Amino acid sequence: MEKVVYKMNTESKLLDRKILRSGHKIDQSLLWMVVLMVSFSLLMIYSASIAYAAQDGGDKWFYLSRQAVFLVAGGIAGSIAAKIPMAKWKKWTPIILTFSLALLVAVLFMGREINGAKRWIHMGPVNVQPSEIFKLAVILYLSSFFTRRAEILKQFKKVGFVGVPIVIGLWLLMLEPDFGSVVVVSVIFLSLLFLAGLPNKWFALVILLSVGLLGMLIMLEPYRMARVTAFLDPWEDPLGKGYQLTHSLMAIARGEWFGVGLGSSLEKRFYLPEAHTDFILAVIGEEFGFVGICVLMFCYCWIGWRAFSIGKQARDLELFYGAFVAKG
């Protein structure tokens, strides 16, 4: 353990030199898989949104065009980010974390309320969701912290200090409210704690505390409990709290093994709410069947596997910060 701590603490001095020697190489297999997934997502957004687009403004290309614009903007931003050395990301981590927390505060006052929650800040032609920036900031923050202060993992009392900014962010997320993002950030935190080498007995204790706290937050809000009970048995109230889940299940069941064909979904024609956003997987299942869903899940798992493989390669080069970021 002492050897690992020593290596992680000396990473900052070696990081710039190693990156300059190795250059900026993009994993080609990961890149092409992402291109494939993005292309498929555009196809399905078009298919699932035709009815909604026609109802909203008559332009069946509306949602596809909007997503394509975001894709181009995201591609440009991603290309720029890929050229920035990891050492600079590490240096900028405190700024990014502070900025993300500031946005979480701002959304409470300036946020656009949708379905009773303030999760978006309207900025001209686009809406920004601060919780997504905070998720990235958490990964960068924990990766930076664990490479600089790995020895803190030996002292359980000090581990809580690591989570102070994260707890503040989680509290702000609960005020929106955005319980889904709270769960995602908690999983990121726990996963990186495990990867950083937190002793098993302490990790088990953190897991128990986290699960207990999340369970308490669910029980304190009736609408969250309603969602849980609807998830466990949507057919108990198929026309009420279980409506979306039952129609999702019917869509997937109608798709059977190989689906009814691209564009032939019935549920997307206003039977299934949010068919082109939150419940687009049901449309994929209806049009491409169980086999289509399995292929999609395989692609996601493959991307995760490649990310961990890249993280392992970075760790082998003693680039521990990059390794944590890739796995996060």
Q: Which ranges hold each PLM region?
A:
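Short, Lys/Arg-rich, polar N-terminal cytosolic tail immediately upstream
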Residues: 1-23
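N-terminal membrane topogenic signal
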Residues: 20-34
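Hydrophobic alpha-helical transmembrane segments of multi-pass inner membrane proteins, especially
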Residues: 31-39, 47, 56-244, 282-328
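Short linear Ser/Thr-Pro motifs
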Residues: 47-50, 265
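Extracytosolic (periplasmic/ER-lumenal) interhelical loops and adjacent juxtamembrane/interface segments
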Residues: 242-263
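Long extracytoplasmic/lumenal interhelical loops at the membrane interface
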Residues: 256-288, 311-317
